[in-house]
């Protein structure tokens, strides 16, 4: 579901809006990435089945 949410956000919101994806915060694969939605649209990522928090900045 996480990957589908990112894909949906990139098609519905302005490309200049920032999206922060914080995943597996208490695990060994901890990751916090912030980039414009226009970059998320072309990025390679896989956050499925990983506890993830999404933050949007306008």
What do the predicted segments below correspond to?
Residues 1-58:
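A contiguous loop/helix-start segment that scaffolds small-molecule binding in enzyme catalytic cores
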